[in-house]
């Protein structure tokens, strides 16, 4: 018994001495200079934040008066599953962090915001530590917001997340932090991808939630650890979801100072070899190679290269912040183009149905024939003949089988019937927004003009603005 007691005391002393050595080592570990972060992101400037409220109010008015009526009338949200809220229009740029588990996503956010060793820092560790979707926003003081509260707040852009169920809302957390960078951008940390875990075990539709954030992100950081490149089925699914968003994707090879130069080159090549089948674009996404954490780079590594890569990433982030309004207006205009094309297609389906119907026809069979083979009735070719319709913007034909499967054709009116004496025609209003109102609003930002005032420089007040997008 005495020997056992002595053994326990000996082990305890070893643990305490080991812990003391770790603490001493962490205290002695030099921290790198952070001045380049504040300088590149212009966080040291005392100038007041730009007031974009007038532009955003004008943008919101254009959306509600010129785009949303046609969108609701032809149930566009049931085709694309992307409902635009006022909170999304007025929201700050969103930066999304994706990648396998324990690659340094949370550590990178802590580093960019300088949250290490503060009560604000995100929990990090070698094991999978993030099981929630964590949204970091600006606030006057540190505050944690439950997911169910975020979804219920219509002023925020997260109310549509309610459709993913209560199990997901329990895995959604908002954190308000009084940080200058968060006045201009919102960070979203995500659970790491674990290849040996089935999606069903999460208790909510993980891929669908990721798609929701991907569709709304202005910048997407896909983070990898060079010491464990594991490209499996879940990561393959993630890159499928990123199709069409290649311009927003930035791949980060984190913890690069853990490898020697030759090994780092091999890992860089192996990463592209693994991702090549998943990224089918001519120009690959930008890859940043660095180490995003507060400790200094390890000796005998390419610290100058890593620092330049980090500054390039910060410049990329700052560019997204600076172009916030331009990106928002371009996004709403692209949304309006898709809504217009959808309305034209539904109108064409309906017109074809009316043309083919006779007194003795079975309406259900007639419309089923049209939906099953729209090319037989020149549905899509007719729409391509319209002004300002690109074949690259046309939705998938298969999507309309599902759309009309839950929305009977009898629920819709022809576009020619969507007019009123006071309100005008829905189609004319959305076309005016696409060709005149939104380009004019975009031009007013660069010229520093009041977006509410008419622009008379080119057309002269009282004259009809020329359609710059119409072919002559």
From Swiss-Prot:
Q: Where is region (G3 motif) located?
A: 189-192
> Where primarily located?
other
Q: Looking at the record, which segments are called G4 motif?
A: 254-257
Span list, region G5 motif? 277
The Dynamin-type G domain sits at 89-330
Gene3D superfamilies per UniProt: 1.10.268.20, P-loop containing nucleotide triphosphate hydrolases
Q: Which GO terms describe its molecular function?
A: GTP binding
State the superkingdom: Eukaryota
Similarity section: Belongs to the TRAFAC class dynamin-like GTPase superfamily. Dynamin/Fzo/YdjA family.
Concerning PANTHER family, the annotation shows: SARCALUMENIN, TRANSMEMBRANE GTPASE FZO
The protein in question is named Sarcalumenin
Q: Which organism is it from?
A: Mus musculus (Mouse)
Gene field: Srl
